[in-house]
Amino acid sequence: MKLLVVGSGGREHAIAKKLLESKDVEKVFVAPGNDGMTLDGLELVNISISEHSKLIDFAKTNDVAWTFIGPDDALAAGIVDDFNQAGLKAFGPTRAAAELEWSKDFAKEIMVKYGVSTAAYGTFSDFEEAKAYIEKHGAPIVVKADGLALGKGVVVAETVEQAVEAAHEMLLDNKFGDSGARVVIEEFLEGEEFSLFAFVNGDKFYIMPTAQDHKRAYDGDKGPNTGGMGAYAPVPHLPQSVVDTAVDTIVKPVLEGIIKEGRPYLGVIYAGLILTADGPKVIEFNSRFGDPETQIILPRLTSDFAQNITDILDGKEPNIMWTDKGVTLGVVVASKGYPLDYERGVELPAKTEGDVITYYAGAKFAENSRALLSNGGRVYMLVTTADTVKEAQASIYQELSQQKIEGLFYRTDIGSKAIK
């Protein structure tokens, strides 16, 4: 069968590469993809994620069995609704179900209504009211754009002044456009963060290995928030009992709640959680695979990925299997200046071979050669699996030390939290 993946980043590279490994898959198209993906035999389609009718026409013309939707903004724009209306199968939630991600206020309302543990909060569209709330509650405090902001719409403010400035930028300076026209301001939760993903169809869900992302740009969790600078899975120091509690008290009630709201969920759900002294609590929900977590979770899948998704789409019980070997760790290489202004056009090192996988996020061929150049904030990610976090770290950082990456940067401490 032929499949289509919608999106262009490292997440979509990992999804498409894994699908192509399946025995019944002859071709995987990626729209629009990036040039680095072609090194893994993936076929790029020059259609933007916002051009739903063109994507639908392409899927029909090329006998695509089903389409996997990668990015949040495509889901928020109702791409799954449009595919379904055209009689095509797409793996991802409808616009209504995806509101769990594209409106933080809606997600909070669902959590409160169905008794899911999360931070105390207030939602504001008026700056003076937001400012008064911040001054009343003090710092540290968290200010979030209500809508989608490429993973950069969250400010963990350590002072009242910083929080007020963040609210001002979103509500009055229009920093994130309509996405920041409302802000959710919530209490700062202390604890260790982790990510929990599941494949979902209605009230049936299948949990994936836990993962830990590294959001800040620089070592020691310093600098601005990014889309993610590296991750590892599973989280070895996280007890299974915590995962079980999170499934029973967070994932299950939210999925049951969203059915009761008339918005049944199909696709991948991603719970960004924090283990507090009072147990796991929700930081956020996302309505799709995470980036960079996808790149370190999917290499751990030992079953046939395309068959698993086909079964879920058809309402059958999928036979999903994961390796229990060690840990999978990945480090993102980004353009200098990311997540703010950055340059493009830096020549990239050759694709890795053997045990270290390269997933490309922002790469394009030079005009007159097959040299790959940087073409985005996050450029590529190196991923490997080893018996321990320490061994995986050593392998990745050894590889990176040999790569010529002037004009690019990476964090040198991915996974260090797991080494006690």
UniProtKB/Swiss-Prot annotation:
Kindly list the positions annotated as binding Mg(2+): E284, N286
Write the record's keywords in alphabetical order, separated by commas: ATP-binding, Ligase, Magnesium, Manganese, Metal-binding, Nucleotide-binding, Purine biosynthesis
- Keyword NADP on entry: no
The note on the cofactor says: Binds 1 Mg(2+) or Mn(2+) ion per subunit.
Under catalytic activity, the entry for this protein gives:
5-phospho-beta-D-ribosylamine + glycine + ATP = N(1)-(5-phospho-beta-D-ribosyl)glycinamide + ADP + phosphate + H(+)
Q: Which domain of life is it from?
A: Bacteria
Catalytic EC class = ligase
Record SUPFAM superfamilies: Glutathione synthetase ATP-binding domain-like, PreATP-grasp domain, Rudiment single hybrid motif
Q: Known EC number(s)?
A: 6.3.4.13
Q: Which cofactor does it need?
A: Mg(2+); Mn(2+)
Q: Could you say which residues bind ATP here?
A: 134-195
Pfam families in UniProt? GARS_A, GARS_C, GARS_N
GO terms for biological process, alphabetical: 'de novo' IMP biosynthetic process; purine nucleobase biosynthetic process
Task: Tell me if Magnesium is a UniProt keyword of this record.
Answer: yes
Q: In which pathway does it act?
A: Purine metabolism; IMP biosynthesis via de novo pathway; N(1)-(5-phospho-D-ribosyl)glycinamide from 5-phospho-alpha-D-ribose 1-diphosphate: step 2/2
One MF annotation (Gene Ontology) recorded for this entry: metal ion binding
- Domain spans labelled ATP-grasp: 108-314
Please report which protein family the annotation says this sequence is part of.
Belongs to the GARS family.
| Annotated HAMAP family | GARS
Q: What is this protein called?
A: Phosphoribosylamine--glycine ligase
The protein's organism comes out as: Streptococcus pneumoniae (strain ATCC BAA-255 / R6)
Q: What is the gene called?
A: purD
